[in-house]
Swiss-Prot record:
It catalyses: Endonucleolytic cleavage to 5'-phosphomonoester. It comes from Shewanella sp. (strain ANA-3). SUPFAM superfamilies: dsRNA-binding domain-like (SSF54768), RNase III domain-like (SSF69065). The lineage of its organism: Bacteria, Pseudomonadati, Pseudomonadota, Gammaproteobacteria, Alteromonadales. Signal peptide: none annotated. Residues 156-226 form the DRBM domain. Its cofactor is Mg(2+). This is Ribonuclease 3. Pfam families: dsrm, Ribonucleas_3_3. The keyword Nuclease applies. Gene3D superfamilies: 3.30.160.20, Ribonuclease III domain. Homodimer. The gene is rnc.
Length: 226
């Protein structure tokens, strides 16, 4: 996979034009592909995402407790949320992976996709500044920030989908593992989620069956709410 191909199109999708396009290339480069990979950018992006979301929640919910703020932040920055953002950006089409990761479907793996989102955030920060990152992230997260509410528990996607369907008196979703790849210590699970209201199934890919089910459920929820 050629890392530089179609990067202008990705920039348009992200809503940011890089001055130094090499930073974006590095953000999309997995450690299996090159020595100059995205892990340091990922470290930086993780911190920037945390401060931007923390600040947004602090001002959005002036009466929320520290515990509620922490739980909401965890929901917004966790891996399955970042994976959904990556899928919306079609990041898998742009990742630069080594032969082994390509063969095992690394461009679908939730950890690689989530890490790439954080690395892109780090790259944008280095290419601009914190305020530019803040505005962009608030745009990426606008819908999620509008929907999230304080509470004792931030329910996971499977629970939310089940409650949504039950509220409409619809049959519950059916989850099936359709593929398992990789060695026992490094497996990738592909799970299919089917519901009556969608003509086609939705696929989730992750390092565990549970995570793959959560990713599939989250995608179904997004489709149902469109």
């Amino acid at each position: 996979m050629e890392p530089i191909k179609n990067l202008p199109r990705l920039c348009r999708t992200l809503g940011y034009e890089f001055k130094n396009i090499d930073l974006l290339t590095q953000a999309l480069t997995h450690r299996s592909a090159a020595n100059k990979h995205n892990e340091r950018l990922e470290f930086l992006g993780d911190s920037i995402l945390s401060i931007v979301i923390s600040d947004a929640l602090y001002h959005q919910f002036p009466k929320a407790t520290e515990g509620d703020l922490s739980r909401m932040r965890a929901t917004l920055v966790r891996g399955d949320t970042l994976t959904l953002i990556a899928k919306a950006f079609k990041l898998g089409d742009y990742l630069f992976l080594g032969p082994g990761e390509l063969k095992s479907g690394g461009f679908r793996r939730e950890s690689i996709l989530a890490d790439a989102v954080e690395a892109i955030i780090g790259a944008i920060y280095l290419d601009s500044d914190l305020e530019v990152c803040r505005k962009l992230l608030l745009h990426w997260y606008a819908e999620r920030l509008a929907e999230i509410q304080p509470g004792v528990n931030q329910k996971d996607a499977k629970t939310l989908l089940q409650e949504y369907l039950q509220g409409l008196k619809k049959p519950l979703p059916d989850y099936q593992v359709i593929n398992i790849e990789g060695d026992a210590h490094d497996q990738t699970f592909t799970v299919e989620c089917r519901i009556d209201d969608l003509s086609e199934s939705v696929i989730g890919v992750a390092s565990s069956r549970r995570k793959a089910e959560q990713i599939a459920a989250a995608q179904v929820l997004e489709l149902l709410k469109k």
